[in-house]
Amino acid sequence: MYNDEIGHYLELARENFYSIKRLPAVLREHVEATPEVMKDVVFFSCMAPLSIYNMRIRIPYLFDREMMGCQVQIFVIANQASGKNNIDFIQSDIMSLMKNFNNSELAREREYERRKARSKSKNIGDPPATTVFMLPASTSKVQVCRRALSVEERYGEPGGVFFYTFSPELGTAVESSKTGFNDLRVLNRVSYDLSGTYGQDHGSELSIHGTVNINQSLLYLGTPGVMANYFNLNSIENGNLSRAIIVPFKQAIGSAAPIFKPIPESDKAFSHKVLQRLFDEVFDSSNSKCLMPEKVVDISFLNAEVERFHEEMSNLAVEVQSEAVDTYRKRSSVSAYRIAAICYNIYNTENQLLDEDEQLPMCQIENNVKKIFRFAAYYILHSTLGIFGNTIETLNMQQKNLFKIVRKTGLYESLPEVFSREDIEVYSGKLFLKSPARSIIPKWLKNNRIVALGDGRYQKIYACQNSN
């Protein structure tokens, strides 16, 4: 199977990745404190909150004409009681500065509502334009649009602030939603790229009309059943899966619960300094109505690695004739490139806070980032195809069969001269039609296209005429 070959590339890339003596700050502390069995899970889980601290960086990509942001969509698949709560602790720790800011914005909204409730006058001013960007997975479409419009009104920059969604139990998050995963899938699909727009026009005075720019990073945790429900055939065909980073966490039956090492206080303090510096590159502390300027991060030194990855996987796709490998290698590379850019920016931020003799040389940073890209690219492709590969190949085969059908003849012409209701069902399936026999037969009888022969059999009229 082709995924075994990808797995071979992955193991070499993983070995090189874990040979890195110094990962970027924040990542370093959490990965080093993690037991071996969960290191991959923790590394990728950290990328979602870290992307929020890097929301102002823009990166040119070899195969894109426009700049990219660093949005990432992480889906951790694990059974119940498997230690997923550790991911909650880690992301909460990384997001602490952002959460404090987000909570202060929520407090401004609540204060306005209190003043509005106490005031006898209706003229208390417009509600404040707030920056509430940490959204539950259960947030409605209308509320998402309201949040995006509020951010745009405040900063004058559509999509300038990335939304962040964390869900420790994805299935529970949408249990009360009338649309289930549908709205969530659409939001996640359009928010992967900087140019993504999201909105509605329902013609209701209670709704938000129009579209907004949405950029979002997310970290979802869920059981295999929930994730299979989220990534159904329609969502796979529409591109949700190709945008996702699938992170499976499997433990052997009867294995002990993972035990994390404590992080030294000195490491915690330094990580906080790095996060504070990154936070200050997002929000302008001197002007509450301004974001910090976008920052172009050039990691073109990765281009050779990107081309190498694509060449290796393109050759494999041709060798095994797999459209799944050929399709999913492309966005695997994009997501890995974004992860590499985040790590590169953190390395440079870390160096700014260190004495010269403690700084990591630029050549070493670039070498480390190359290893990070290669590991991430193969991991994303391998995990996606390892879990959903058969489904993807089946979907591709169905699409091929659909396009092979020449629809010059309809159901009537395709049927034999004498046919039954069962024949109608069979031929309808071959032509991908959904018309039931109980509605077709009365119509054809009324229009004198068929005659009933009895015993549940029918004959075409032109066949009767030809036999005379």
Regions found by a protein language model. Give the residues of each.
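Phosphate-handling catalytic cores of nucleic-acid transaction enzymes
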Residues: 1-468
